[in-house]
């Protein structure tokens, strides 16, 4: 049926339009049907119209879907690359002259062309690229700055691997201040940031339903109050200079606020709504981002040179302070003049965070010179065009921390000012704010939390210091000693004098020891007596016969009656006449021991039985001139007791030996007793010994023994005599 109609339609071209519409109405067009036709082909000439109507279109398969999706992904990827290349400034290399200032300032000089290697890729090293698994070798002796804004915000389970930099923070420019908010993802555990800390904390308002400012880009309020976008890339020095220690750029617990320095101030609203009090701003280096010197413009948005001041604030940044809060701040923070100096107070939390880091931050009050500010204020009040000097940021060496910064030659530019648009005081304030700090403050006085000699502005102005060094304390740690001896010293001297007098008196009236062997006078006092070789000497009389040195308490040598000290005896040839040891026969070159008219080495004079050294110990010599100690001599040669059989030795504690000799026998005194009754036998008449059959008996026991025997031939024995002999 359908085929016939299509053939008829081919034959009658005039009715083709109506038939075609009827056919299209009958066809089921849609993707919900299970076996519906996708659509009819209506494009074609009159000749191939039938063929087009006969061919039905089928649904796309998996291959077609894959090709279409891949094409769409490629297009999206290309669009993203174009967008990134449009607003991203990739890694930049700076000349070697800016290496030192790179650690202090973010972008001190206009960037140069990246030097490519033979493969066409710049060899640099980025910490963020290292997280992604990439390793790029850095160029030698050149600092590399990484555009932290390129990667956006990211989070990881490894908190320590995340770069703690402003690249993952949201920024907004409010009334000339570029505010860098801390990380919302909880980068710092000790500084929790609430989730609702958005643009409301910055004091900015956004229209209902309006698009929020893009992440990673600064939102600024224009002259009309609308939000405007500024592509302000943030760079971080990721390679420290050789010999310089890498330092953190900001405290982790504080938010970073950059102050935009405008060349001119044409509107009174920008000066009246100052945003934050200048007294609450912290001293920090100036950062300059220069586009070109030829594209200068007087407008605030298209300024060729934008200056940002790094101002550290607490993470809980409050809204814009009111007049009452500003008045309270001014009560605690002194301000010299409206258009003159700006006194920057230091936040205690900021100092605590800086002190807890790994470097010493020298926070200070910046005392600005009021001459330039007053001159600009007068020119603005009179309505004459003021000529403002724009000075390039100084290049500070790596060792500069507390001194003057050598600035480049200034360049002048004429900027029209309007005195009718704003009062004199706000205009002077704005002019001072737009003036670089390097021009108005040639001397930056940096004070350390610890006391130092250069802690005042006068000392810093007179003696500018170069180098981060710790100065000596202005006060003396050790108090000066008073003139003359102290009371304790006087007491010690008095006691010493009394002791010396007592010693002299005791020597004069001391103990008498005897007559000196040399001079024949009396020896009194222990300090004057000296005993040697069995004789008594005065201390001053017993001296070396060669050098006259006193020999008390020292080694000496007696050579033929003459005494020598050890030095004279050893090195003056007197050892040739030295005596020989009576035991070993060798010369006695050191200490000598004399006994029984002979000389011995102290080590050679020993007991022949027990081999004990007898130096200073009593000894005995037998008939063969053998040397014995006392105990060994008595054990060998002492008489034996006839009763107990033991040797009769001297009584303990004495050198005397007592024995009893009776009946040609030797007895101990304690062994000479009656064997029957135990009575001590002596030479007394009633205590004499009456021996019987070889036994010691007294007279009574002797008679009893005879009575018991009842022998007619037994006769009475006469008593025997006993003698007591003492041996010394």
From Swiss-Prot:
It comes from the Eukaryota. Residues 290-303 have a biased composition (Low complexity). Gene3D superfamilies: Cysteine Rich Protein. Residues 1-17, 304-317 have a biased composition (Polar residues). GO terms for biological process: cytoskeleton organization; follicle cell of egg chamber development; mitotic cell cycle; negative regulation of hippo signaling; positive regulation of imaginal disc growth; protein localization to centrosome; regulation of DNA-templated transcription; response to hypoxia. It is found in: Cell junction, Adherens junction. Residues 29-49 have a biased composition (Gly residues). GO terms for cellular component: adherens junction; apical cortex; nucleus; P-body; transcription regulator complex. Residues 1-20, 28-49, 189-225, 287-317, 407-427 are annotated as: Disordered. It holds the Pfam family LIM. InterPro entries: Ajuba-like, Ajuba-like_LIM1, Ajuba-like_LIM2, Ajuba-like_LIM3, Znf_LIM. GO terms for molecular function: metal ion binding; protein sequestering activity; transcription corepressor activity. Residues 514-575, 579-639, 640-708 form the LIM zinc-binding domain. Its main location: other. Keywords: Cell junction, LIM domain, Metal-binding, Repeat, Zinc. The keyword Disulfide bond does not apply. Regulates organ size by inhibiting apoptosis and promoting cell proliferation by influencing the expression of G1/S-specific cyclin-E (CycE) and apoptosis 1 inhibitor (th). Negatively regulates the Hippo signaling pathway. Interacts with sav and wts. Belongs to the zyxin/ajuba family. This is LIM domain-containing protein jub.
């Amino acid at each position: 049926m359908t085929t016939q109609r299509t053939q008829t339609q081919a034959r009658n071209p005039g009715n083709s339009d109506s038939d075609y519409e009827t056919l299209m109405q009958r066809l089921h067009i849609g993707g919900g049907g299970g076996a519906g036709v996708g659509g009819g082909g209506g494009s074609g000439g009159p000749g191939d119209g039938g063929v087009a109507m006969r061919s039905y279109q089928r649904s796309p398969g998996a291959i077609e879907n894959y090709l279409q999706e891949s094409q769409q992904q490629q297009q999206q990827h290309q669009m993203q690359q174009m967008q990134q290349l449009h607003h991203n400034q990739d890694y930049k290399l700076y000349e070697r002259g800016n290496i030192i200032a790179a650690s202090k300032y973010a972008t001190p000089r206009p960037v140069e062309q990246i030097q490519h290697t033979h493969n066409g890729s710049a060899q640099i090293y980025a910490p963020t690229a290292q997280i992604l698994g990439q390793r790029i070798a850095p160029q030698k002796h050149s600092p590399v700055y990484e555009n932290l804004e390129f990667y956006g915000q990211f989070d990881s389970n490894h908190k320590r691997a995340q770069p703690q930099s402003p690249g993952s923070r949201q920024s907004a420019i409010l009334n000339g201040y570029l505010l860098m908010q801390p990380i919302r993802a909880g980068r710092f555990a000790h500084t929790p940031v609430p989730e609702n800390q958005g643009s409301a904390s910055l004091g900015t308002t956004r229209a209902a339903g309006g698009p929020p400012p893009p992440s990673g880009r600064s939102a600024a309020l224009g002259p009309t109050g609308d939000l405007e976008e500024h592509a302000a890339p943030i760079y971080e020095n990721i390679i420290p200079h050789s010999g310089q220690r890498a330092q953190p750029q900001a405290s982790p617990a504080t938010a970073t606020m950059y102050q935009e320095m405008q060349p001119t101030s044409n509107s009174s609203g920008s000066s009246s709504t100052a945003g934050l009090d200048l007294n609450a701003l912290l001293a920090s280096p100036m950062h300059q981002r220069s586009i070109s010197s030829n594209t200068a413009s007087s407008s605030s948005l298209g300024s060729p040179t934008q200056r940002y001041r790094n101002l550290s604030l607490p993470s809980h940044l409050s809204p814009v302070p009111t007049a009452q809060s500003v008045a309270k701040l001014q009560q605690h923070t002194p301000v010299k003049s409206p258009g003159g100096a700006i006194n920057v107070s230091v936040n205690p939390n900021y100092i605590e965070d800086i002190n807890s880091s790994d470097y010493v931050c020298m926070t200070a009050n910046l005392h600005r010179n009021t001459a330039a500010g007053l001159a600009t204020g007068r020119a603005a009040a009179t309505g004459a065009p003021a000529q403002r000097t724009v000075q390039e940021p100084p290049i500070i060496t790596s060792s500069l921390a507390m001194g003057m910064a050598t600035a480049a030659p200034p360049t002048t530019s004429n900027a029209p000012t309007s005195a009718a648009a704003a009062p004199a005081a706000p205009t002077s304030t704005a002019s001072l704010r737009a003036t670089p700090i390097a021009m108005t403050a040639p001397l930056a006085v940096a004070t350390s939390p610890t006391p130092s000699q250069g802690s005042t502005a006068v000392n810093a102005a007179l003696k500018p210091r170069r180098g981060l060094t710790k100065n000596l304390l202005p006060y003396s740690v050790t108090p000066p000693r008073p003139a003359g001896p102290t009371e304790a010293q006087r007491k010690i001297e008095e006691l010493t004098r009394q002791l010396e007098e007592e010693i002299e008196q005791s020597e004069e009236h001391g103990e008498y020891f005897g007559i000196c062997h040399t001079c024949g006078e009396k020896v009194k006092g222990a300090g004057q007596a000296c005993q040697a070789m069995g004789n008594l000497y005065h201390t001053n009389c017993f001296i070396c016969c060669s050098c006259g040195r006193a020999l008390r308490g020292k080694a000496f040598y007696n050579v033929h009656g003459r005494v020598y000290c050890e030095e004279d005896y050893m090195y003056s040839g007197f050892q040739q006449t030295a005596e020989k040891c009576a035991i070993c026969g060798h010369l006695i070159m050191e200490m000598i021991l004399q006994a029984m008219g002979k000389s011995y080495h102290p080590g050679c004079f020993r007991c022949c039985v027990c081999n004990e050294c007898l130096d200073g110990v009593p000894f005995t010599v037998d008939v063969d001139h053998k040397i014995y100690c006392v105990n060994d001599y008595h054990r060998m040669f002492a008489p034996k007791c006839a009763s107990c059989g033991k040797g009769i030795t001297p009584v303990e504690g004495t050198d005397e030996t007592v024995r009893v000799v009776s009946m040609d026998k030797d007895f101990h005194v304690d062994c000479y007793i009656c064997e029957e009754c135990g009575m001590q036998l002596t030479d007394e008449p009633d205590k004499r010994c009456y021996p019987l059959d070889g036994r010691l008996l007294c007279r009574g026991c002797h008679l009893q023994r005879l009575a018991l025997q009842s022998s007619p031939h037994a006769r009475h024995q006469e008593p025997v005599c006993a003698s007591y002999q003492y041996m010394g």
